[in-house]
């Protein structure tokens, strides 16, 4: 079983092979997702909402992410493991270096940061020091209070151009992957076509190189609000591993995301 690396994902992109990602927070679920063939696992700060019961991701700490990264690492043999850098853990280059090191030592293969031009120095610094970076644009949940809620981004021409420009700049700074969240499908397609690095979408249409969902949404166990872009695969399959397999297959076949999961 060959391990998935950022180079593997670049090959998938060049071959037009769609890949899948899921969040994971413990060894058992991570092992199930990994063994079924999920390519990327994210220890996401989404744990603040789906595990800890908060209304947003802001209370999550580096220690929280590091603990769950160690747990997930023990269940993973094949998938690329990304750890989220939580709110205010990368506000300065010095903080970024210290906290990214902690997450890599916990078992991550890559760290993920949210933001655009202001992050370029930190992305370059991490990359030059051997820490791979996944960038995140569009609806960045750590900025929810700036946005005034969980709202679609990039619908007007100026913001769409800004997001595209930031995507190109982050790639130039050394980012190896990019997540785009809750942006119009045409913008996500333009970004995917403009970059050589793989682009992973969530609520961003079917034209990105890969798709990511929160595991609780895929399994229909989220409490409260269910995002429009998600799909409950457990409901249609009745078994966790079958649900994961259905998600992988539908992404590979271009069935998911469908129009009802996409923003115009």
Swiss-Prot record:
Mg(2+) binds at residues 45, 84, 114. Binds 1 Mg(2+) ion per subunit. 3-methyl-2-oxobutanoate binds at residues 45-46, 84, 112. One of its GO terms (molecular function) is magnesium ion binding. Its EC number is 2.1.2.11. The keyword Phosphoprotein does not apply. Pathway: Cofactor biosynthesis; (R)-pantothenate biosynthesis; (R)-pantoate from 3-methyl-2-oxobutanoate: step 1/2. Its cofactor is Mg(2+). Catalyzes the reversible reaction in which hydroxymethyl group from 5,10-methylenetetrahydrofolate is transferred onto alpha-ketoisovalerate to form ketopantoate. This is 3-methyl-2-oxobutanoate hydroxymethyltransferase. It comes from Shewanella piezotolerans (strain WP3 / JCM 13877). The lineage of its organism: Bacteria, Pseudomonadati, Pseudomonadota, Gammaproteobacteria, Alteromonadales. The gene is panB.
């Amino acid at each position: 079983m060959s391990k998935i690396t950022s180079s593997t994902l670049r090959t998938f992109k060049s071959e037009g092979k769609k890949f899948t990602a899921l969040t994971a927070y413990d060894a058992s679920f991570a092992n199930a997702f990994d063994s079924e063939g999920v390519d990327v696992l994210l220890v996401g700060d989404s744990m603040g909402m789906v595990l800890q019961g908060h209304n947003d991701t802001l209370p999550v700490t580096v220690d929280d992410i590091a603990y769950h990264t160690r747990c997930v690492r023990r269940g993973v043999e094949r998938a690329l493991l990304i750890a989220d850098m939580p709110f205010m853990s990368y506000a300065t280059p010095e903080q970024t270096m210290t906290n990214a090191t902690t997450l890599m030592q916990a078992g991550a293969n890559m760290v993920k940061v949210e933001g655009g031009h202001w992050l370029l120095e930190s992305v370059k610094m991490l990359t030059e020091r051997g820490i791979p970076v996944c960038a995140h644009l569009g609806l960045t949940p750590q900025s929810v209070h700036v946005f005034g809620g969980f709202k679609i981004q990039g619908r007007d021409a100026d913001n769409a151009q800004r997001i595209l420009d930031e995507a190109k700049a982050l790639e130039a700074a050394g980012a190896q992957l990019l997540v785009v969240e809750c942006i119009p499908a045409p913008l996500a397609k333009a970004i995917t076509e403009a970059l050589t690095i793989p682009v992973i979408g969530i609520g961003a249409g079917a034209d990105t190189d890969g798709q990511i969902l929160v595991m609780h949404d895929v399994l229909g166990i989220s409490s409260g609000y269910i995002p429009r872009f998600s799909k409950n695969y457990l409901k249609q399959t009745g078994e966790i591993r079958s649900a994961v397999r259905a998600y992988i297959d539908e992404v590979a076949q271009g069935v998911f995301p469908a129009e009802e999961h996409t923003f115009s």
